[in-house]
Swiss-Prot record:
Gene3D superfamilies named among the record's database cross-references: Aldehyde Dehydrogenase, Chain A, domain 1, Aldehyde Dehydrogenase, Chain A, domain 2
Keywords: Amino-acid biosynthesis, Cytoplasm, NADP, Oxidoreductase, Proline biosynthesis
Name listed for the protein in its UniProt record: Gamma-glutamyl phosphate reductase
Catalytic activity, reaction form: L-glutamate 5-semialdehyde + phosphate + NADP(+) = L-glutamyl 5-phosphate + NADPH + H(+)
Length: 430
């Protein structure tokens, strides 16, 4: 007998709550694992994923076939796709996490009080970590690896478009957990038949300690707006690159701009808007625009303004363009009257991810760094560097654009919290 929508919804909600309660139950077990225990699981999981490549690719092909039948774009199909090389990359990511320092138990502060009490502030796991993400199966294993190494349990709510791939990946991990005598509830894949299952996860207060959304602006906004569980907002990236009148090397500035825009245009640290100082020679302004177009980038802007410096082929921009995270070979371009105007434009449209300046003026650079509100500010560097590995932090779960609990690349330490341990010798408070 076929279930109606109400039956599906009821069953799905029950499944989410069963998973959340199970995760809450096993969280203390994971929190007490030694670094050696966690590393052994991660390394065995890496090997098991590579060994199960054919199984994973077959499941992934089902998702690809269904995605094409539903009319998914080839760009989305590419994000969804897994092959031997990508599986090797995912396995390599687990090995990298195993090699990272374990943050759990790290003493990050403390002192001896005048009464002799010893105070220690130590890192401890967050607990049950929920992940809501879109059609990138690699996130399934990234989240598992980072959660485990930081002593957390993972509840994963992936996209329906990747459900077979995600299920195959988690099945491999479950076999490894079982071989180490650990419960499979260390990582669980939540049902994804309806969008409401996200709501079930993000309102499971008391069972889930934090939810991290990773995906497009709509997904992130929906989670942050509706959650009662604490959330960490991983950013949409409307990243700006400002080229100042005192730029010391225009060719270098153009190279940084092109790197930020074209290296990987579909990631959150890609440059989406270029702001050019109107005091720059018009030939330099034109050179910047031309370089973008020659690299295959479509330039959106004020047509009259940009044609006045000799540019052609400009797509008219409206208010939407200045706020747009294109995630494609498109860029918004505007001429601005100096660094203050650039900072005002950024303040108006920024998602507070990464903002960059190209200048040879130390005072201007410092002014920009001090006044721009963003998780990362680049001075004479590409926006593409906002990345946990590039920052020397190792693997990351995402880039946080909020100010609490973490900001910027979220690596292992950012997936912990702290507690105070106070060692006394019988002291009582007067």
């Amino acid at each position: 007998m076929l279930m109606n929508n109400a039956d599906v919804r009821s069953q799905e909600r029950k499944q989410v709550m069963v998973c959340a309660r199970a995760a809450h139950r096993v969280a203390p077990i994971v929190a007490q694992l030694t670094s050696a225990d966690k590393n052994a699981v991660l390394l065995d999981a890496a090997a098991a994923l590579e060994a199960a490549g054919a199984e994973i690719i077959a499941a992934n092909q089902r998702d690809i076939d269904q995605g094409r039948a539903r009319g998914l774009s080839e760009a989305l199909i590419d994000r969804l796709s897994l092959d031997s090389a990508r599986i090797a990359g995912i396995a390599g990511g687990l090995r990298q996490v195993a090699a990272l320092s374990d943050p759990v138990g790290e003493v990050v502060g403390g002192s001896v009080m005048p009464n002799g009490m010893q105070m220690r502030k130590v890192r401890v796991p967050l607990g049950v970590m929920g992940m809501v993400y879109e059609a990138r199966p690699n996130v399934t294993i990234d989240a598992f690896g980072l959660a485990l190494k930081s002593g957390n349990v993972a509840l994963l709510r992936g996209s329906k478009s990747a459900q077979h791939s995600n299920a195959a990946l988690v099945a491999v991990v479950h076999r490894v957990l079982e071989s180490h005598g650990l419960p499979h509830e260390v990582v669980q894949l939540l049902p994804c038949e309806t969008h409401e299952s996200v709501q079930d996860l993000i309102t499971a207060r008391g069972l889930v300690d934090v939810v991290i959304p990773r995906g497009g602006a709509g997904l992130i906004e929906a989670v942050v707006t509706n959650a009662t569980v604490p959330t960490i907002e991983t950013g949409t990236g409307n990243c700006h690159f400002y080229i100042d009148r005192d730029v010391s090397d225009l060719d270098q500035a153009i190279a940084m701009l092109l790197n930020g825009k074209t290296r990987r245009c579909s990631v959150c640290n890609a440059t989406e808007t270029v702001l050019i100082d109107s005091a720059l020679d018009s030939a330099y302004q034109l050179a910047i625009i031309t370089a973008l177009q020659e690299a295959g980038v479509t330039v959106h802007g004020d047509v009259a303004q940009l044609e006045a410096v000799g540019a052609s082929g400009i797509v008219p921009a409206d208010e939407h363009d200045w706020a747009e995270e294109y995630l494609s070979l498109d860029i918004a371009c505007a001429l601005v009257d100096g660094v203050d105007a650039a900072m005002e434009h950024i303040r108006t449209y920024s998602t507070k991810h990464t903002e960059a300046i190209a200048t040879g003026n130390i005072v201007t650079a410092q002014r920009f760094a001090d006044r721009v509100d963003a998780a990362a500010v680049m001075i004479n560097a590409s926006t593409a560097f906002t990345d946990g590995e590039q920052f020397g932090m190792g693997a990351e779960i995402g880039i946080s654009t909020q100010k609490l609990h973490a900001r910027g690349p979220m690596a292992l330490p950012e997936l912990t919290t702290t507690k105070w341990i106070v060692q006394g010798t019988g002291q009582t408070r007067p």
